[in-house]
């Protein structure tokens, strides 16, 4: 069936000026034509979706999410991750639908505990049982025994354990491997994290990183690393990690390594701030009156 989608304007995300009065022609699951309304004839009996004064654009890609987290909830991030897997799966289904309704059509889930909740939700979306964006998932994030985020990942110390952990994550359904490669923890609370964690100390040796990448690449899977800064930035890029998550404390002399080895930075915390009691928080987004924002 052919569907015609009309709107006030279209942003094609190429840098071009918005197209006014666009019409998108969809045949089945594929967009076959985009044109302005004056240059296209819509059959009288056609299936038309008229978006009025709204703006159309390509789907957004969120490169770093945790399906068990929801900034609108009163619990801290850590408390949410410690909830039973069943509850986190239900909540995740709700937030993923909200993500899609906000325009996120693809997302990368980088660690949701040891129960593979992200795998379950990805597969349910793919089967059409729940509504949400297409997901790439890490299944089980990997961290050292003295690393950060104990509620998110499984422990692997040394080259042999690293290799086994990567294999296990792939067996459990991982599309991407997530490593916590910086932050050596000095405590269990967010206050410890804020005041005591060694954010620029490598959590793994360079050889451990190389082993993880070797094992992942054998299966055609890329590796992402939670990395704040320090020597591990260069180690990770040399080892072949595809992305560094956060990278808040990188230095100027790290930049050539990104250019040479082709890695990129994915920073999901652009709207987060850190509270010494509750941990990571978002601004009071619940107070925004989204329905009163002007069309753009």
Language-model segments: residues:
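Divalent metal-dependent hydrolysis catalytic cores, especially in the metallo-beta-lactamase
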Residues: 91-117, 131-143, 174-188, 222, ...
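Histidine-rich, glycine-flanked metal-binding segment
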Residues: 2-3, 10-57, 78-79
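Histidine-centered divalent metal-coordination motifs
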Residues: 7, 54, 64-66, 226, ...
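Metal-associated gating/positioning segment near the N- to mid-region
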Residues: 54-129, 207, 239
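Active-site mouth loops of central-metabolism enzymes
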Residues: 77-90, 147-164, 222-224
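Active-site environment of divalent metal-dependent phosphoester hydrolases
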Residues: 68-71, 102, 109, 113-117, ...
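Active-site gating/metal-coordination segments in enzymes
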Residues: 146-210
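Active-site core of metal-dependent hydrolases
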Residues: 186-296
